[in-house]
Amino acid sequence: MVSVNGVPAARLPVTLPGEDRASRKAPDYLMVEQPPFDELMYTIGETIELSCAAEDASTTTKWCKDGIGIVPNNRTSTRQGLLKIINVSSDDSGIYSCRLWHSTEILRNFTIRVTDLPSSGDDEDDDDDDDDETEDREPPRWTQPERMEKKLIAVPAANTIRFRCPAAGNPTPTIHWLKNGKEFRGEHRIGGIKLRHQQWSLVMESVVPSDKGNYTCVVENKYGSIRQTYQLDVLERSSHRPILQAGLPGNQTVVLGSDVEFHCKVYSDAQPHIQWLKHVEVNGSKYGPDGDPYVSVLQSFINGTEVDSTLSLKNVTETNEGQYVCRANNFIGVAEASFWLHIYKPAPAEPVEKALTTSSSSITVLIVVTSTIVFILLVIIVITHLMKVPSKKSMTAPPVHKVSKFPLKRQQVSLESNSSMNSNTPLVRITHLSSSDGTMLANVSELGLPLDPKWELLRSRLTLGKPLGEGCFGQVVMAEAIGIDKERPNKPATVAVKMLKDDATDKDLSDLVSEMEMMKMIGKHKNIINLLGACTQDGPLYVLVEYASKGSLREYLKARRPPGMDYSFDACKIPAEQLTFKDLVSCAYQVARGMEYLASQKCIHRDLAARNVLVTDDNVMKIADFGLARDIHNIDYYKKTTNGRLPVKWMAPEALFDRIYTHHSDVWSYGVLLWEIFTLGGSPYPGIPVEELFKLLKEGHRMDKPANCTHELYMIMRECWHAVPSQRPAFKQLVEDLDRVLTVTSTNEYLDLSVAFEQYSPPSQDSHSTCSSGDDSVFAHDILPDEPCLPKHQQHNGAIPT
């Protein structure tokens, strides 16, 4: 091999005539002498400008760094024979060459060195200064130990990593590198390494997971040796569309002629393509024939994995007003944020004389209007006072429905005169009174509730059956009701009836009434448990809802796990129906549709889990207990202020730590429910104590992909578990995504029987009730898959949680 100015010549592989390249064991090389190297030195932040020219001006040239073609980006630009790099960093150090296009001929070579300080060429210059200060012999020592404190380095795959061990000594020490305790050289790694001895550094480009390990620099001279070990962790890139920082860019209103800036922060593992767009009109229309809006591209560029992009508009005019879009896309998908720019045009100033005249007139008008209003108010007060005295004598108390068996000490049921048949307003309003102790309601038989003809069912048409389950304050029984089905009024229908227990309090009564009224307002949907009727007159309160014969989704899935495993309920019993992968996707899709409907009704569930989804005889998923949620109307969050029982393992971090509930926190819970579905009723975070769970969630840990789950569905789960609530998908988006997955899924794709589900199941079950309302109830039985308040007698044939 030939060297030019101490630099090895280029090696070019040559294929001999008539020879198959693939058949050779090792390539032959043709030695090509390179032109001399121009050595140039720059300081971090400066601009590099290099040039070369071919003999023929029409010949195209290209630029390479360390033998690899240079791709223009936001810092690097190339033109015919010119290379420009702005804001250089130490990573820009290397060998640059100018070559003829489609040729191996090199026109010019440059050795570029980028240093930290203008006064020194490299780290070794500082070391020489240290050596000049003393004539004593000394062992090696670190010159910049503060830059070596970070010993654990984690980077995404395909990034460039550099380890540095700047040192000094007399005589000047040498440096070599070890990986996992063994000598490390370029041939040990695909892609090779770069050893920059003058900078005491090791550089690896485009790292991959196999590059993980411990890297040790050994610095030594004849008087001693020192070493430093770095741990490298290479993270797999996640397949995720770009993420835009919430709240950016925001709407702005500026004065005509001023300047304005919009910021858009983009996060993406894959390099994103970022565009700034403005909505425009074409021939008076904002939309094209295909329904897509017309837009003009203001800016467009490709950048790194974390980008803070800015759109600057100078001296804005009325034509700048309108809707804008920041759009980012990678090979996974697209994310965009719309915002508006409004232009304020100040009115021209009025002449001084006219302004004074207008001001005087305004004061006069104001005085006259104020006097008139005061006079009218005085007249109204006098008339009201005169009418009030006789009205007291003639007033008679209207008839009031009274609670005949017990007083409501803490809360009172107040009556409305209008029916709820044609109104979304609750018929029964709960008002809080000042008294307090949660009195027990023994032997409840009559309530002073108003008659609602739309929902009322005569007790004579209802036949109660066997109990289905009971909770902390209520119970559910199966029943036969006549007249529920309007098309077949004389045919009995099977329903579930919610009622209070004997030891229920007035608070429990209030909750059941509120749940009934909430179900009235929310309306009907195929994928929620619908209200069928109520018995409110001449006896205890009965709330009739749809009956789901196959019980909760969690028990439904567990009962249909593949046979022959230790986790089966009965090892000798084969499930009546075997689930396919499409069945599981269908379950997820139906629950998403139900939650999409509840979200459209401004209803936050707060306790979405497989145990609160019921399954009908036709395998229809129905969300239950949403009536216990809060109607948020104009406020998109509900902040819990009491220390009630909380389903910890299903709760979003903002709900867990800040007690803030939104539709976004319901989406997090839906992600956990997805995990339950694809583990066939597994317990989330198996084996992890609650205290440890808090810590793991804060650190960003998430559950692993279930065995019977595709990568696409797992990425949907991970999107539901995004740390930023506003970045989680809406239920509408989840419905669209799952509908697409459902469409392309085969109906014959059965589950993998080799997967053991015991890893997702708790080690034991406990059937007793844990209805404590104390602060510690959240942690009392974390090994159970359900929240701490469990039903006492859970059946599998249609029990509806209360």
Curated annotation (Swiss-Prot):
Put simply, this protein is called Fibroblast growth factor receptor 3
Glycosylation site residues: N74, N87, N109, N214, N251, N283, N303, N315
Q: Which residue stretches does the UniProt record annotate as biased composition, category Acidic residues?
A: 121-136
Which PANTHER family does this UniProt record tie to the protein?
Answer: FIBROBLAST GROWTH FACTOR RECEPTOR 3 (PTHR24416:SF505), TYROSINE-PROTEIN KINASE RECEPTOR (PTHR24416)
Record bears the keyword Transmembrane: yes
Q: List where Basic and acidic residues composition bias occurs.
A: 137-148
Q: Which gene encodes it?
A: fgfr3
Annotated positions binding ATP: L468, G469, E470, G471, C472, F473, G474, Q475, V476, K498
| Pfam families for this protein | I-set, Ig_3, PK_Tyr_Ser-Thr
Q: How is its activity regulated?
A: Present in an inactive conformation in the absence of bound ligand. Ligand binding leads to dimerization and activation by autophosphorylation on tyrosine residues.
Q: What are the start and end residues of every segment in region (Disordered)?
A: 116-148
Q: What does this protein do?
A: Tyrosine-protein kinase that acts as a cell-surface receptor for fibroblast growth factors and plays an essential role in the regulation of cell proliferation, differentiation and apoptosis. Plays an essential role in the regulation of chondrocyte differentiation, proliferation and apoptosis, and is required for normal skeleton development. Regulates both osteogenesis and postnatal bone mineralization by osteoblasts. Promotes apoptosis in chondrocytes, but can also promote cancer cell proliferation. Phosphorylates PLCG1, CBL and FRS2.
Disulfide bond residue pairs? C52-C98, C165-C217, C264-C326
Q: Which UniProt keywords apply?
A: Apoptosis, ATP-binding, Cell membrane, Disulfide bond, Glycoprotein, Immunoglobulin domain, Kinase, Membrane, Nucleotide-binding, Phosphoprotein, Receptor, Repeat, Signal, Transferase, Transmembrane, Transmembrane helix, Tyrosine-protein kinase
Q: What is known of its domains?
A: The second and third Ig-like domains directly interact with fibroblast growth factors (FGF) and heparan sulfate proteoglycans.
Sequence ranges on the Cytoplasmic membrane side: 384-802
Q: Where is the active site?
A: D607 (proton acceptor)
Q: Mention one GO molecular function.
A: fibroblast growth factor binding
Query: A Gene Ontology CC term for this entry?
Result: receptor complex
